[in-house]
Amino acid sequence: MEFLFGRRKTPEELLRQNQRALNRAMRELDRERQKLEQQEKKIIADIKKMAKQGQMDAVKIMAKDLVRTRRYVKKFIMMRANIQAVSLKIQTLKSNNSMAQAMKGVTKAMATMNRQLKLPQIQKIMMEFEKQSEIMDMKEEMMNDAIDDAMGDEDDEEESDAVVSQVLDELGLTLTDELSNLPSTGGSLSVAGAKKGEATAALADADADLEERLNNLRRD
């Protein structure tokens, strides 16, 4: 059928065809208007020439031709303006048609997405996701508890070592203060011998104090 009667033109093709016809008509009107304007200039020149020669009858006839020519020029201008307005309307229709086609494509895409997005399946997926997330959180919490239990003794030992070190540091400062009160080696041997028992007693007291603090820490 298309071979016999020709292929049916689409709206876009018809719009382009009409647009070309209107543009061609406007170009022809412009050419005719330019010819009339040239003729108008020639008539004006002839009128001036005849007026100088005193041929007033010819001047009157040419004046009528001039008026008629100017009217035609005005009509051509108005006609071209009307054709241009129609051309703009066709362009607007073409733009609207393009917009409609775009909206049609978007509508089809949205319809396809709506058909593919099945709410029951999505709800089922979300419920399963929440379930698996809760299971993962529980497993993570259990693993953290197990790790804390395994590492707890080491943490306690580290804290105990830190406390013992702090106590030893404090006792070291005390022992240093006690030893600073002892006489220097430059003193007499008899005095040093006399103070030896006192220094030994001081060290014994310091050791006893250290042992008592360690016992208290173990009980705590």
Curated annotation (Swiss-Prot):
Gene3D superfamilies listed in its UniProt record: 6.10.140.1230
Biased composition (Basic and acidic residues): 211-220
Compartments it resides in: Late endosome membrane; Cytoplasm
Motif MIT-interacting motif positions after renumbering to this chain: 208-218
Gene Ontology biological process: endosome transport via multivesicular body sorting pathway; exit from mitosis; late endosome to vacuole transport; nuclear membrane reassembly; protein transport
Family the entry assigns: Belongs to the SNF7 family.
Name of the protein described by the UniProt record: Charged multivesicular body protein 2a
Source organism of this protein record: Xenopus laevis (African clawed frog)
